[in-house]
Amino acid sequence: MSAQLRAAAAITPAARRVISGPAAVRRFHHYHHLPTGGIQRVEIAARGLRRSVQFPALANAYHNNAVIVRNASFTRLLPKLALKFIRVPALFGGMMLGAVGWVQYQAIKVSNSAQEFYGNIKATVADTAFSVWSSAVDIAEQTKRGWENTKNQFEIPEWLDRIMKGEGLAGEGSGSGEGGPNGGPEPPRQSRAGAATVAGASATVYGYGASDNDDRTPEEIMRDDNMMFITKKMIEIRNLLQKVGQGSTVTLPSIVVIGSQSSGKSSVLEAIVGHEFLPKGSNMITRRPIELTLVNDPEAKVDYGEFPDLGLARVTDFSLIQKTLTELNQSVPESECVTDDPIRLTIHSPNIPDLSLIDLPGYIQVAGENQPRELKRKITELCDKYIRGPNIILAISAADTDLANSTALQASRRVDPRGERTIGVITKMDLVEPEKGAAILSDRQYPLKLGYVGVISKLPPQSGLFRRDTGNLLASINRNEKNYFGSHPTEFGPDSGVSTGVMTLRKKLLQVLEQQMSSKLNETTEAIQRELEETTYQFKVQYNEQPMSAESYLAASLDDFKHQFHEFASSFGRPQLQTLLKDALDQKVLDQLAARYWNRPIEDLSPAPREPDNIIDLPKADPDSPYWHRQLDTACSGLTRLGVGRLAATVAASAIQQHVEKLLDKSSFAKHPSARKVISDAAATVLADRSYATSDGIEISLKPYKFDPDIQPNEWAQGREHVVGVLQAELEQCQAAMKALENSVGGRKKLKEVMSFVDKARKGEIIVEGDHPSGAGGFSAALLARGREAVFLRDRADILSLRIQAAKSRQCKTLTNKYYCPEVFLDAVATKLAQTAVLFLNVEMLNDFYVRFPREVEAKLHEHMHAGGGLEKFAREDPKVRRHLDLIRRKELLETVLGKIEELHRISSGTAGTLGLRGAGDLKKRIGAPSSSGRRSFF
């Protein structure tokens, strides 16, 4: 323990005693953590020194306690403290200087690296720009010289010359304006693109970029452009033929892609397209055929895809296309695994050729644990369905597997034993030795007339923090293939006799598809002509050449419905409304009479209590009887205050809605549930809009009658005559109900026995205690319930008969005896209410409905028909109309196909002269040019 700490320890007891006394004002607590050496000890000594000199009370403590402190020597303590206080700032200062020096060193190092990096980038960009500019100048000069030679050697057709001069558009260059320098016609404007654009239309498709040398001759460039154009037209014709629906007799070939799951089939398709868009996964992903149509669209700014069957257009995100394809494939149940329902996808891009491809599920050797056993057979049957002629087979095989075990080649051999329409594609060429790869491509054991093409369609995995740009997939694959195949010129060079590269595959596919389509065009044209003749004949015989479209059918149906509605409006007016409302009020009158006068319910078999005032005694009752006065006043008040306004609006709306439904049943909309619902909802909407206002107006107009009905003598006479018929109808209903009860219990005799037992019990002749579930008197509980109901109906019928006689009697002839004839009075009140209410109904609801309903129907139908193809769906709901529309559509499509074939022939005839004698002959032969006799071969 140092001297400082011992001094502090000696002072502490005295200080503690002083602080604990009454004069103590505060207590100091000191905590020392982590003694780290001299610095901490210096601070502790300083705090001990401050405690010893800070409080004056310590002086008294020294005298009172006689404590001797020997080692409290300031002469030794102060120099050490000063030395340590100087050492601490020096230590921190040294650390600060070191940190500043290190930061400065790192800053200088980063600055030098940035300058070096910037210099490298600057030099690289300058070199690249100079190289690109030099290459562009060389290409432009070479193209210019080649085009000049081509113009001297070949005669340019008129249509091509017009395009090059900017005269190809209709209406241009034919005006008589004074735009020329001398006031004459303005000379034709030259095309900005020039010959280079026309001649290089296929350059991007075949992979010739700005930095590549297009080694094709002008003749080859022209031939390739024509081939692309013809293929585009052929694919358009093929798509039209698919819409015709005659795939068995009228068809053009497509390219069917087959291969095992591990052969790299998806990678080849993505390399051809230039985007990753197919589903990925270790398990089988492709469960439905994918009919892929590639469209070369020079006007497209970005690549995009379309799903015509789903209504998805211009999907520029290919990851979304991949997700959509995955979901469509996963929609197939696991138990089914594969289906022949195709997924149609169209991809537009300026960098792809016009091709028609079909991607099929990959072949498997053994079904998985969660897959059905017949999966292998289903996949084989599905592939066999598509690889039949005239489709072109793209058989994908991996280079690291023996061709003898290639499932794709085995399948193609079954349907194409001579290999005339099969292209072999060998993937993963970089996984085998170059000599072995070249031997596979030049294979003679499994020869194909269209040959083999070796590709490296999948890029090697890239390490590092940055992922490769998938948007430029084709360029990356092309660069990778050139590096690999170029490093082995002996095996894969121009003189090796083998075909390699995705670009070569794209060109071969385009050539083969064009040749196959052209070779089938004659046969297709003849089949189309036969189909068109048959369709025209059926159209004339069945429909008398009457044109029809979905729009015309809807218009005709709507006109017919409107005509029927106008006939209904002219026959349904105020008299009909008053009759309906009076019938509804008659039922309310009967309800009031039954509640106040007629009801004699039989709840059980106990004796009936005696009634002092019976309806049977009403004709002889005192004319000033308060009971009968109160009964009539209560019934009248209940009738006028039951809500006649709402009742009238409801009755009118229900009647109109029912008539609209009847009109729909008779119209052509009866065969169209969705359109019928739209019209019915439109009627309900119009009626509901006016219901509240109409009922409110009726209640206001009927308010005086709630206090004084003010019945006139003529109204009394009409009510007396009308109520007899109402009571007679009620009596007939009671008799019909009694007849139904007789049939339900087994006859009139049985019912009379039960009724007799009930009458005796009600008179007290038979004592029945309670209503036992087992019955009484030998009758079951259900039979006794029927008996009580029959007694009630009998008593009601007797009362109705008496009241009919009373209404016809002299007593009910005048209004002064209204208390003796409540039926007549209430009927007269109901007639007055109906006459007043129908005035508002006719103006506020009926007339408004007749005006608004036709407009509402047109608006709602227009909205419904133009939502999601509703118009076409509406027309095709009628089987007869659907057959009519299908026949017309079929006829129009066949005519369009023949027109496109004729256009294709005219264009090919115009371009044949630029291809030389041999090329012209080949082109005419492929697409059916006119024969030497002047008659076209396929016409």
Swiss-Prot record:
<dbReference type="InterPro" id="IPR027417">
    <property type="entry name" value="P-loop_NTPase"/>
</dbReference>
<dbReference type="InterPro" id="IPR020850">
    <property type="entry name" value="GED_dom"/>
</dbReference>
<feature type="region of interest" description="G4 motif">
    <location>
        <begin position="427"/>
        <end position="430"/>
    </location>
</feature>
<feature type="region of interest" description="Disordered">
    <location>
        <begin position="170"/>
        <end position="196"/>
    </location>
</feature>
<feature type="binding site">
    <location>
        <position position="428"/>
    </location>
    <ligand>
        <name>GTP</name>
    </ligand>
</feature>
<comment type="subunit">
    <text>Oligomeric complex consisting of membrane-bound and soluble forms of MGM1.</text>
</comment>
<comment type="function">
    <text>Dynamin-related GTPase that is essential for normal mitochondrial morphology by mediating fusion of the mitochondrial inner membranes, regulating cristae morphology and maintaining respiratory chain function. Exists in two forms: the transmembrane, long form (Dynamin-like GTPase MGM1, long form; L-MGM1), which is tethered to the inner mitochondrial membrane, and the short soluble form (Dynamin-like GTPase MGM1, short form; S-MGM1), which results from proteolytic cleavage and localizes in the intermembrane space.</text>
</comment>
<feature type="binding site">
    <location>
        <position position="457"/>
    </location>
    <ligand>
        <name>GTP</name>
    </ligand>
</feature>
<dbReference type="GO" id="GO:0005874">
    <property type="term" value="C:microtubule"/>
</dbReference>
<keyword id="KW-0812">Transmembrane</keyword>
<keyword id="KW-0809">Transit peptide</keyword>
<feature type="region of interest" description="G1 motif">
    <location>
        <begin position="259"/>
        <end position="266"/>
    </location>
</feature>
<dbReference type="InterPro" id="IPR030381">
    <property type="entry name" value="G_DYNAMIN_dom"/>
</dbReference>
<feature type="region of interest" description="Paddle region">
    <location>
        <begin position="710"/>
        <end position="809"/>
    </location>
</feature>
<keyword id="KW-0460">Magnesium</keyword>
<feature type="binding site">
    <location>
        <position position="281"/>
    </location>
    <ligand>
        <name>GTP</name>
    </ligand>
</feature>
<keyword id="KW-1133">Transmembrane helix</keyword>
<keyword id="KW-0378">Hydrolase</keyword>
<keyword id="KW-1015">Disulfide bond</keyword>
<feature type="transit peptide" description="Mitochondrion">
    <location>
        <begin position="1"/>
        <end position="27"/>
    </location>
</feature>
<keyword id="KW-0479">Metal-binding</keyword>
<dbReference type="InterPro" id="IPR000375">
    <property type="entry name" value="Dynamin_stalk"/>
</dbReference>
<feature type="binding site">
    <location>
        <position position="264"/>
    </location>
    <ligand>
        <name>GTP</name>
    </ligand>
</feature>
<feature type="binding site">
    <location>
        <position position="265"/>
    </location>
    <ligand>
        <name>GTP</name>
    </ligand>
</feature>
<dbReference type="GO" id="GO:0003924">
    <property type="term" value="F:GTPase activity"/>
</dbReference>
<feature type="binding site">
    <location>
        <position position="262"/>
    </location>
    <ligand>
        <name>GTP</name>
    </ligand>
</feature>
<feature type="binding site">
    <location>
        <position position="266"/>
    </location>
    <ligand>
        <name>GTP</name>
    </ligand>
</feature>
<dbReference type="InterPro" id="IPR019762">
    <property type="entry name" value="Dynamin_GTPase_CS"/>
</dbReference>
<feature type="region of interest" description="G2 motif">
    <location>
        <begin position="285"/>
        <end position="287"/>
    </location>
</feature>
<keyword id="KW-0496">Mitochondrion</keyword>
<dbReference type="GO" id="GO:0046872">
    <property type="term" value="F:metal ion binding"/>
</dbReference>
<keyword id="KW-0999">Mitochondrion inner membrane</keyword>
<feature type="transmembrane region" description="Helical">
    <location>
        <begin position="85"/>
        <end position="103"/>
    </location>
</feature>
<dbReference type="Pfam" id="PF01031">
    <property type="entry name" value="Dynamin_M"/>
</dbReference>
<dbReference type="GO" id="GO:0008017">
    <property type="term" value="F:microtubule binding"/>
</dbReference>
<dbReference type="InterPro" id="IPR022812">
    <property type="entry name" value="Dynamin"/>
</dbReference>
<feature type="region of interest" description="Stalk region">
    <location>
        <begin position="549"/>
        <end position="703"/>
    </location>
</feature>
<dbReference type="GO" id="GO:0005525">
    <property type="term" value="F:GTP binding"/>
</dbReference>
<dbReference type="GO" id="GO:0005743">
    <property type="term" value="C:mitochondrial inner membrane"/>
</dbReference>
<dbReference type="GO" id="GO:0140523">
    <property type="term" value="F:GTPase-dependent fusogenic activity"/>
</dbReference>
<feature type="region of interest" description="Stalk region">
    <location>
        <begin position="810"/>
        <end position="877"/>
    </location>
</feature>
<keyword id="KW-0472">Membrane</keyword>
